A protein has these predicted regions:
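PRPP-associated nucleotide enzymes
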Residues: 1-310
Length: 310
């Protein structure tokens, strides 16, 4: 087993390498003057099982192309098999046609990864579980729920807690966390007039005098979560804690969160946000490297990955 990292999130790759006590494969990933990406594997990997770690995060197009070219380089270097470890699977939000004459980018990206030569994919909290079915190769979709539940038990005080889904699509994810914590759930009915903008309409469930725990897979511009927190406080919630797997945090998201009614936002390091959150005191990052490292170890040893979540 050998590990290779792309440029999208070297921090998490180094942590996984340390967890597995395995050095990263030496490689050169450069750009030509016209922006084309150049990949070279600088050591022999013939006959080895390779785990390539690369998130499809901003700049999404460059990081996607880098992922595909790395897979191609590994294939042409006679790797025995290639597992694409994609902590954040970009383009997953376009998983169906939401309007006439639109693309389904999640399916296209799945095809590209498969055609490039990947034998397996490992990712974390896919935006829609059915994306696993877009692939013709095995996909292990890991969950941040165990990491979040441990943090909540240690850090969120009080007995009157409730888990909150920020929209109807997040109910299953919220229910999974609520089961682990033995809590009830509430749901926010959200209407989105345009992409990137949201308006909270209604809260389904009693949140008065309760500590609310919002759970979701992605925070992008921050509008959905900030509006959700405000709606909960306006309906009598005591305080709002937010747990989100992928911190995209585009534009002025960190500023919105700093000024919002959110007591604290907890994200994972599937996306490298070290520069964005330096001044945001109410944003905390939990590392998901041990979960990914353990999954890689189990795949390499042909043992169960699903047992991690029992």
């Amino acid at each position: 087993m050998k590990l290779l990292t792309g440029n999208s999130n070297k921090n998490i790759s180094q942590k996984i390498s340390k967890f597995l006590k395995t050095k990263l494969v030496h490689s050169s990933i450069k750009k030509f003057s016209d922006g084309e990406i150049y990949i070279e594997i600088n050591e022999n990997i013939r006959g080895n099982s390779i785990f390539l770690i690369q998130s499809i995060s901003s700049p999404a197009n460059d990081n996607l192309m880098e992922l595909l070219l790395c897979i191609d380089a590994l294939k042409r270097s006679s790797a025995k098999n290639i597992t694409a470890v994609i902590p954040y699977f970009g383009y997953a939000r376009q998983d169906r046609k939401v309007a006439p004459r639109t693309s389904i980018s999640a399916k296209l990206v799945s095809n590209l990864i498969t055609k490039a030569g990947a034998d397996r994919v490992v990712t974390v909290d896919l935006h829609a579980g059915q994306i696993q079915g877009f692939f013709d190769i095995p996909v292990d979709n890991l969950f941040a729920t165990p990491i979040f539940s441990r943090h909540i038990k240690r850090n969120v005080k009080g007995k009157n807690l409730i888990c909150v889904a920020p929209d109807v699509g997040g109910v299953e994810r919220t229910r999974a966390l609520a089961r682990k914590l033995d809590l009830g759930i509430a749901i926010i009915d959200k209407r989105r007039p345009t992409p990137g903008k949201s308006q909270v309409m209604n809260v389904v469930g009693n949140v008065k005098n309760k500590t609310c725990i919002i759970v979701d897979d992605i925070i992008d511009s921050g509008g959905t979560i900030v509006n959700a927190a405000e709606a909960l406080i306006n309906r009598g919630a005591k305080e709002v804690h937010v747990y989100i797997t992928h911190g995209v945090l585009s534009g002025e998201a960190t500023e919105k969160i700093k000024k919002s009614k959110i007591k604290n936002l907890v994200i994972t390091d599937t996306i490298d946000n070290s520069n964005k959150i330096k001044k945001a005191k109410n944003i905390e990052v939990l590392s998901i490297c041990n979960l990914l490292g353990e999954a890689i170890k189990r795949i390499s040893n042909s043992t169960s990955v699903s047992d991690l979540f029992k």
